């Protein structure tokens, strides 16, 4: 009889923990709020009450890293596509802030695991936004 091999997600193997992911997410969104490019887009979409959004995003990231199961929301794409203020040219800035935050708070291995997830999200969102913007 063979022993099943447990699948270990790269983020967990990279040394990510729930407190670290929470710290990165909170720090990242503080930067976003103060950013000249992204701040106004997020402020218009979220309004004045950031707490519910932050908690939803926190659960998303904890689920994406497989540190916790708790995000039961929809795919992130529809909410972003319906907002015309979100444009593909903003994604490099979003990634720049995320990379900066992860690098400043994580080991290189943990930062790489988080940035990998962020890059895949940005790539997927860029494709969707370009299709949206090309639609007649």
Question: Predicted regions: what is each one?
Answer:
Residues 1-136:
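Core of compact, soluble alpha-helical bundle domains
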């Amino acid at each position: 009889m063979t022993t099943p091999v447990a699948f270990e997600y790269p983020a967990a193997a990279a040394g990510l923990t729930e407190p670290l992911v929470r710290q990165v997410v909170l720090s990242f969104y503080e930067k976003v709020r103060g950013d000249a490019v992204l701040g106004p887009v997020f402020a218009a979409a979220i309004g004045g009450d950031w707490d519910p959004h932050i908690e939803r995003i926190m659960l998303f990231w904890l689920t994406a890293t497989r540190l916790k199961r708790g995000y039961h929301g929809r795919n992130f794409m529809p909410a972003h596509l319906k907002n015309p203020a979100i444009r593909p040219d903003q994604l490099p800035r979003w990634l720049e802030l995320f990379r900066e935050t992860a690098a400043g708070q994580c080991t290189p291995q943990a930062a790489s695991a988080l940035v990998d997830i962020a890059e895949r999200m940005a790539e997927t969102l860029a494709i969707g936004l370009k299709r949206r913007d090309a639609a007649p």
